[in-house]
Amino acid sequence: METFCIETLASDTYGKALNVDLDRLSQAQIKYTLQELISYCSALTILHYDYSTLAARLSVYQLHQSTASSFSKAVRLQAAQSCSRLSPQFVDVVYKYKAIFDSYIDYNRDYKLSLLGIETMKNSYLLKNKDGVIMERPQDAYMRVAIMIYGMGKVVNIKMILLTYDLLSQHIITHASPTMFNAGTKKPQLSSCFLLNVNDNLENLYDMVKTAGIISGGGGGIGLCLSGIRAKNSFISGSGLRSNGIQNYIMLQNASQCYANQGGLRPGAYAVYLELWHQDIFTFLEMPRLKGQMAEQRLNAPNLKYGLWVPDLFMEILEDQIHNRGDGRWYLFSPDQAPNLHKVFDLERSQHENAHREFKKLYYQYVAEKRYTGVTTAKEIIKAWFKTVIQVGNPYIGFKDAINRKSNLSHVGTITNSNLCIEVTIPCWEGDKAEQGVCNLAAVNLAAFIRENGYDYRGLIEASGNVTENLDNIIDNGYYPTEATRRSNMRHRPIGIGVFGLADVFASLKIKFGSPEAIAMDEAIHAALYYGAMRRSIELAKEKGSHPSFPGSAASKGLLQPDLWVRCGDLIPSWEERVAQTTQGVLTRKSWRQLRLAAIQGVRNGYLTALMPTATSSNSTGKNECFEPFTSNLYTRRTLSGEFIVLNKYLIDDLKEINLWTEAIQLQLLNAGGSIQHILDIPAEIRDRYKTSREMNQKILTKHAAARNPFVSQSMSLNYYFYEPELSQVLTVLVLGWKKGLTTGSYYCHFSPGAGTQKKIIRNSEKACNADCEACLL
């Protein structure tokens, strides 16, 4: 008699084993019984994280009962469907090498997924038939992605297919969501991020609505620059009429986003960007709001994300106004009367009259010529921005000049906007030989390199190199929705390697966020990430050639990403010694010197690193998001897959070591909403290490960002967390970040309670109480 025993799936230290006689149940009853057990175990997660592990394994078991037992069979069943998404070429490769793939794939690795991970895979990544029935297992999806990367070209590279499968299935790396759910299909749009620049003519305005919709339908997130659109009531010489400005156009894109969801798997996602000198800036800042005059009149567009492209000049004027050194006067323009302000930037931040400050020069030239259409103050703009941030958490802030002056591709053109999450910064333009920016993303699991004797920087370097090669192949194998996206990606070959699990690293090694050791390690980890990517990109250039826009790039002159920071005065030259010390000699001055010399000969990719939010990737692997601290030690995570209790297992393990994980502590943790700061029975040293993102001084997040940013080719999705919506606190970190040379000022500003947060009741089946829940914003 077959008996299903929970004790064989996970240790149950708090309850007795539950045995179910499967022979006496129908398939429907088995499914129902398993689902009951999964829900029951999930509700008990507050007692111990092993219950969540148990629920995850039950969920995997349930999936395995309804899916094919071999990879080739899963592909065959999908290919036989009348509306199969799989490409014939992919199916042919699988059939040809099915003996290798079937024998290599390890379905037991599915049981390593967290509950949040397996449910995310089921709902977002695993291919389904037309009736919504899941047709593959997580391991099948990983193999599908690996074959897409290394099996769809002229040569089927079995060795790299199996290596990539191992890296994915062992959760050492993750690829972006579009890659996961489009790999191997007839229309494999594998890229995550697209950047569009909207021109000020009717044809292009509507072209960009169409282009954005097509991209969104394939799973891509979109960033649009609106700074070139003439302001409201501007004269249109061709028709003799007046312009509607950006408001109606934003509403049009808002409607398009709602319609063109990402392949039916998640809502469409657009971000619109505007520079602060634009006459319509106050309209722009009000459009995201859920309350206010525009919202009441339904003239808002709350489904979009918003971003500000902020020049140094504005920050200088704002700082002077804050400290009563100036009146804060800020001039507003319409781009038809004051052209090209969004196409120039300040190469230097110096106040010297001979400094290379093209934006400042042109701005004041237009002021002198009285081309401005309005006058306000820097404070008024910031107050309007903050009023919106309190409601919805954005607009984001990107520091325009820092982004451009520290770009390896600054010779290509001015970067006018970013993407959905403000970590991708690729030049884009419309018109003759238009280029629409594209970036392919992946992330490395930093926790995978924790060792008993410290941290494995060599392993991280190697993994970063492997991801670099993966992403470079994706550029060649992917589908492009427009010729302008293909042209841009082939010319610059940008990739964006991010990270997740930094908080897991610090917790495992008992290092406190904000400590000198943590900041040094943050710097060293991202130095290793960048080094590994650059080294492999140089090797690929020797084999396949450099990206076409390599001549004139910073790398072609022997300048690495941190060198651009040194040149700007935002990084001291002794950084190499510091990294050498932290990595214990893995990366030395000689390492970087050799890398510079090699880069001059050629680099395959124009960009290498970009630190994205990694919400879904982190969910699927059970690690903390990107480079962030823990948002709470106990909360409910709301995703497209449902709601899941998340318990900080590192805290539990530390408390168990000193016999403090008791029912009394559990209740206090619940009542405190996941905080341990006022649980005085817990030693101060542990309380200090497990401060959540809201509980630590936000300057700590800025200092960490400043440590890692010199090794980021593009930018980062930098969040801040505040208890109260106080403008002075937010301005403190924004100004500090700007002075430290950060490329991103802010992604989301979270307030408690505020945008993206809620109170959620969690407890076992008998009792419940409140705890904070950090909802996924992507």
From Swiss-Prot:
Activity regulation description: Under complex allosteric control mediated by deoxynucleoside triphosphates and ATP binding. The type of nucleotide bound at the specificity site determines substrate preference. It seems probable that ATP makes the enzyme reduce CDP and UDP, dGTP favors ADP reduction and dTTP favors GDP reduction.
Pfam families, alphabetized: Ribonuc_red_lgC, Ribonuc_red_lgN
Key words of the record: Allosteric enzyme, ATP-binding, Deoxyribonucleotide synthesis, Disulfide bond, Early protein, Nucleotide-binding, Oxidoreductase
UniProt enzyme class: oxidoreductase
Known EC number: 1.17.4.1
Chain sites annotated for binding substrate: 177, 192-193, 221, 419-423, 613-617
GO biological process, one term: deoxyribonucleotide biosynthetic process
Protein function: Ribonucleoside-diphosphate reductase holoenzyme provides the precursors necessary for viral DNA synthesis. Allows virus growth in non-dividing cells. Catalyzes the biosynthesis of deoxyribonucleotides from the corresponding ribonucleotides.
Protein name per Swiss-Prot or TrEMBL: Ribonucleoside-diphosphate reductase large subunit
Source organism (scientific name): African swine fever virus (isolate Warthog/Namibia/Wart80/1980) (ASFV)
